Structures are given as structure tokens and as C-alpha cells.
Amino acid sequence: MAPVSGSRSPEREASGAKRRSPSRSPKSIKSSRSPRCRRSRSRSCSRFGDRNGLSHSLSGFSQSSRNQSYRSRSRSRSRERPSAQRSAPFASASSSAYYGGYSRPYGGDKPWPSLLDKEREESLRQKRLSERERIGELGAPEVWGLSPKNPEPDSDEHTPVEDEEPKKSTTSASSSEDDKKKKRKSSHSKDRAKKKRKKKSSKRKHKKYSEDSDSDSESDTDSSDEDSKRRAKKAKKKDKKKKRRGKKYKKKKSKKNRKESSDSSSKESQEEFLENPWKDRSKAEEPSDLIGPEAPKTLASQDDKPLNYGHALLPGEGAAMAEYVKAGKRIPRRGEIGLTSEEIASFECSGYVMSGSRHRRMEAVRLRKENQIYSADEKRALASFNQEERRKRENKILASFREMVYRKTKGKDDK
């Protein structure tokens, strides 16, 4: 351990000597060497050897012969040389990055890249590549999820006729499953009913035994009365059971009838679908004798409300309408000016109508005005009749009033 410590201390001294060299003169250096450094001659030689070792280690293997000649001078040199060679790269790093025409690519304190780091990077890269290949083959369900096993059929590829066979198979399978479930439920319900009956019968037996023990203690007359009561109770219970069974049988029958009707209707619908698969079945078919558009349902339900369509006849309108009625023609509505009544009737028969609200309003006005029409003679007769009736009423009222006034005045005169 002594030579190693000695090899480190001269390095520090050498660096200190380099720093001091420009300030001191050569005489002072000699004087400092002569008295003091007799003991440390080996140290100075080791300094020289350290410097040579640094330069030789960086310049190459060609200078190894010189190192051998320096080693032969003293044992201290040969002991201190390997330690100097060990510390050579670190000393060169602390000093400049250029020695003997050889420059380090990294410079400064950065170490050389090791082979282990490269091998680690290569192994990590290979692992990453293999992992990505595996993900590409198998997929990552936690990120993307799985695709559907049975995708929905395309409307262009699969027509409804092609899809009928799988539909029938699925319906048959579902119906068989439903039948199995119903059978299981019915069996469970029967077992429960049997258990309940057994419990009831056991309770009845216990009651009977208790009643028998009580009846033994009582008289014979009481026992006969109890027997009759029991018989009556038994008969009532039997009647109730029969009624329940009858109800259950009726329910089962109704369920069977419903199933049969539903099955028959489904079969009929399937047959119709096979005959005409492209028919629209969203609307229910209702036989209608009417030709043209149907009347709106809102008007049919508005019988309770008073209709308030249009207003009174305009001046001259009644006479014009009366002429149409006399001729037996259809009265034209407003908005139909320019067309004859025959043309309008032919258009309506073929299915042409006005826009919805206008058509309803004008049709109602036309019907109301047709009912209002009177000829001029009828109007005169009505007016004269009304006037005569009014005069008669007035005369009656006046006559009764005169009589009353006369009676009162006559009674006063007599007094």
C-alpha cells in the first residue's frame, strides 16, 4: 500500500510544480532541490516517470521500450509505474483533451461508451419489435375491443327471402325454450300445491283428533251435532275445490286458445310475406267505398262544438245562388270564379280539391248558404205573415188593456 500512496502524492506535487514554474527562477529551483530533495530523489524520479507514463500510454505501444529502461533505474520507479499508468486516463481527462496528436472524440470528463450499454439498448429494441409484432397479430382488446362475431347482414346482400330459414330456426328454438320454461314453472307450482294440501290435511287431522277427544268427554248429542257440522264443512270445501279446478281449467283453455290464435296469425302473416315480401304492412287495410281523399277525423269528432264558418250572405249573393239552385246546378264557391259548375263537378269527381283548410271552410259556407236560400216571393210571404201576426198580438193586448181600464173607471163612477 506504501507505493500507491506515494504515487498519488507526487501527482499532486507535479501539478503544483507546474503552476509554480513560471514564477520561480532556475537558481531557486536548484537551491530547493539540493538540500531538501536528497531524501525525495526517488519521488522526483517518480514524477518524471509519471509524466512519461501519461505520454506513453496515450501515444501507443511503440514507446514501451523506453518505459522498460526507466524501470531499471530503481525499485521505487518500478513500484510506482503501474499506479501511474492506472491513474493516467483520469489525469489526462483533468488536463487538456489533446496528447501526442491523439484527440478524444468526447472531450472533457465524458467516459467512452461501453459495450454493455449498447447490448442493453439492442435487447430492448428487439423486445419492443417482438411485442409490436405480437400486438399486430393478436390485437389489443383492452385498447380497441373485439369485433362482433355475428355482424348484421347488409340490406343489399341479404334479401328477406334468404333470411327466412334462419329466422324460422331461431323462432322454433325460442318457442321450444319457452315451452320448457313453462313446463318447469307448472311442475314447480304443482309441487307447491301438493305440499300445501298435505300441510292442510295434517292440520285438519290434528284438529279432528283434538275435537274427538273433546267430544268423548261431552255427551252423545254434542258428538252427533259436531259430526253433522263436519260433514257440512267437508261438503263446502269439496265444492270450493271443484270451483277452483274449474277456474284453472278455464284459464288453461283460454291460454291454449290464445296461443293457437297467435300461432295461426303468425303462420298467416308468414304466408303473406312469402307471397308478397315487398308489400307495406305498416298501415292496416280497411275496405273503403269512397273514392278520393278521406275526410279528416277531427271534423267527425267535432259534432258537439258549434261550427262557426263564414258570415251572412253578401248583397246580391242570395239571388245569384237561387238562380243556380233553380237551374239545378252546383253553387260555385269563392275562389272558383272562371270555371263553370260542370267543370268544377268533374274536377271534384276525379279527386281534385283545394288546399285543406280553404276547402273545408268554403265547403261549410256553401252548404250553410244553400240552406239559407229563399226566393223573393217566399221572402215577401214570410214578411207579410210576420206583420199580420204582430198586428193581431198588438190588438189583443190593447183590447185587454182597454177593458181593464174601463172596469176600474166604471167602478169609481158607481161609488
Curated annotation (Swiss-Prot):
Annotated stretches, region: Disordered: 1-311
Gene Ontology MF terms: chromatin binding; chromatin DNA binding
InterPro entries: NKAP, NKAP_C
Modified residues (Phosphothreonine): T159
Coiled coil: none
Keywords: Acetylation, Isopeptide bond, Notch signaling pathway, Nucleus, Phosphoprotein, Repressor, Transcription, Transcription regulation, Ubl conjugation
Signal peptide, first to last residue: none
Residues with N6-acetyllysine modification: K110
Classification via Pfam families: NKAP, Nkap_C
Biased composition (Basic and acidic residues): 116-136, 156-168, 259-270, 277-286
Listed Low complexity bias regions: 23-32, 54-71, 84-108
Task of the protein: Acts as a transcriptional repressor. Plays a role as a transcriptional corepressor of the Notch-mediated signaling required for T-cell development. Also involved in the TNF and IL-1 induced NF-kappa-B activation. Associates with chromatin at the Notch-regulated SKP2 promoter.
Family according to the record: Belongs to the NKAP family.
Designated name of the protein: NF-kappa-B-activating protein
Annotated organism of origin: Mus musculus
